[in-house]
């Protein structure tokens, strides 16, 4: 197993595409960022995901949260009232890209991305009060966010939800009281 850092996983993906033998001895493990770069037509991409066959998928989840001085748990009403709602965006072609769509669908008109902030940098800006909304995947949510929730400094807003094989969306067991995005969408839009 070899990780090749840099380029939003494009470097490593391109290297695998160029050097891997199609004999079943190579496995291409990729993140959402790898897929988003294909979907957005990034000219640096030299790999063709349609030529690969999925063998295992790992369900991941996104947890959205804010500071307790900005909102009540699971309630976007105060966030939606703000004229400016800042959030971190690693790059325009990162996995965070779908957050723009999520915030639009939830009617957060003041949502504005701050590009160039890594997950860690964005979270530090959030803790300093420079960013209003933040999100993390499961591992960082458990390690970094849950302790802040327990201290009363941070509140859950929602999770993306876990998509079942039948297409149903269930709540994340790491935050069972937090609504899923479909639940929040229905709450906000009826």
Q: Where in this protein do the model-derived segments appear?
A:
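C-terminal lobe and pocket-closing loops
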Residues: 145-190
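Solvent-exposed loop/turn segments at secondary-structure junctions
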Residues: 7-8, 32-36, 61-62, 70-71, ...
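Structural signature of the Rossmann-like NAD(P)-dependent dehydrogenase/reductase core
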Residues: 3, 29, 85-88, 158-161
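Short, conserved clusters of charged catalytic residues that mark active-site
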Residues: 11, 47, 140
């Amino acid at each position: 197993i070899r990780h090749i850092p840099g380029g939003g996983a494009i470097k490593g993906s391109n290297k695998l595409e160029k050097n891997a033998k199609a004999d079943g001895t190579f496995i291409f493990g990729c993140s959402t960022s790898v897929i988003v770069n294909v979907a957005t037509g990034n000219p640096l991409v030299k790999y063709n995901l349609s030529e690969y066959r999925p063998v295992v998928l790992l369900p991941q989840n996104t947890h959205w949260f804010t500071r307790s001085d900005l909102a009540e748990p699971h309630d976007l009403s105060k966030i939606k009232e703000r004229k400016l709602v800042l959030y971190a965006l690693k790059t325009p072609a990162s996995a965070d890209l779908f957050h723009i769509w999520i915030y639009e669908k939830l009617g957060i008109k003041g949502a504005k991305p701050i590009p160039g902030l890594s997950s860690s940098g964005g979270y530090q800006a959030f803790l300093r009060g420079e960013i209003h909304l933040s999100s993390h995947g499961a591992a960082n949510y458990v390690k970094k966010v849950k302790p802040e929730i327990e201290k009363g400094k941070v509140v859950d807003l929602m999770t993306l939800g876990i998509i079942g094989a039948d297409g149903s969306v269930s709540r994340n067991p790491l935050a069972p009281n937090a609504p899923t995005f479909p639940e929040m969408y229905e709450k906000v839009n009826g």
